[in-house]
Amino acid sequence: MADKVLKEKRKQFIRSVGEGTINGLLGELLETRVLSQEEIEIVKCENATVMDKARALLDSVIRKGAPACQICITYICEEDSHLAGTLGLSAGPTSGNHLTTQDSQIVLPS
């Protein structure tokens, strides 16, 4: 599942993600109602460094479960191809329900 993939990529995500991608992800997660405005503000205001924000963001998404993680992965693949490549992520080409990592392919239920 997507949550397992994000857990496996957590350290690398925290080290690699930029502030622009974090802000874009926060916007996407608010728009898709994965995170509330309050949760967004906590990530932005209570974490001083980009790495702290990345850690708080990813941990919040992982706690929300596999569908939330898939939204996060899809956003990364569509909006930050360099980060997606660094993490070995790619979203499925058609339905968005396929997640391919360097190690395995996971098919998420529709």
UniProtKB/Swiss-Prot annotation:
InterPro entries registered for this protein in UniProt: CARD, DEATH-like_dom_sf, Pept_C14
Molecular function, one GO term: cysteine-type endopeptidase activity
Keywords: Cytoplasm, Protease inhibitor, Thiol protease inhibitor
Tissue specificity comment: Ubiquitous.
UniProt induction comment: By IFNG/IFN-gamma in monocytic cell lines.
Domain CARD: 1-91
UniProt KW Cytoplasm keyword: yes
Cited SMART domains: CARD
UniProt keyword Methyltransferase, yes or no: no
Subcellular location: Cytoplasm
CDD domains from the UniProt entry: CARD_CASP1-like
GO BP term, example: negative regulation of interleukin-1 beta production
GO cellular component term of the entry, any: protein-containing complex
Protein role: Regulator of procaspase-1/CASP1 activation implicated in the regulation of the proteolytic maturation of pro-IL-1beta/IL1B and its release during inflammation. Inhibits the release of IL1B in response to LPS in monocytes. However, unlike CASP1, do not induce NF-kappa-B activation.
PANTHER family per record: CASPASE RECRUITMENT DOMAIN-CONTAINING PROTEIN 18, CASPASE-1
Subunit structure: Interacts with pro-CASP1.
Name this protein carries in UniProt: Putative caspase recruitment domain-containing protein 17P
Source organism: Homo sapiens (Human)
